């Protein structure tokens, strides 16, 4: 119960910031949200090689095992920390990006609706594995109705 309250507070703050930043225009920008990094960095390397004209932002969780300082041309921010400043910067970049590229499930997607013109793309982070995920995960039905509803809102954000 306490965890659900914490999640609800976090998502409310996230939604408020996101809606506040909606006044800013969408920019030619790709924001990568990385919990792992492998696939996202491969895509970034390909974009750089093909000279795709987009600003790039990395939002990374502490679980990301790559040294993003090796990419000084990219703005990088730690994501989902207790830092209010990092949260504000992260939400701003998400709100103003033309492309949002994620490598995992992120609950904040249940609280927002991207502006028309923004594409949210989910990368599969476990190439070659065979497992059930998303709504087919056997544990899905064991979750609370509130959790199930939030998961469905997240999955509705993908194109």
Regions found by a protein language model. Give the residues of each.
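N-terminal pre-catalytic "stem/leader" segment of glycosyltransferase-like enzymes
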Residues: 1-88, 99
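Detector for Asparagine
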Residues: 19, 39, 86, 93, ...
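Short N-terminal targeting/anchoring amphipathic segment
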Residues: 32-33, 92-107
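Glycosyltransferases and closely related glycan-assembly transferases
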Residues: 48-51, 92-96, 109-120
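Glycine-rich, histidine-containing beta strand-loop boundary motifs that form or position
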Residues: 60, 104, 124
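Short catalytic/ligand-binding loop motif for oxyanion handling, primarily in non-cytosolic enzymes
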Residues: 65-68, 108-111, 129-132
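Active-site-proximal region of nucleotide-activated glycan assembly enzymes
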Residues: 78, 114-159
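Catalytic micro-motifs at enzyme active sites that drive phosphoryl/nucleotidyl and oxygen chemistry
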Residues: 87-90, 107-113, 150-152
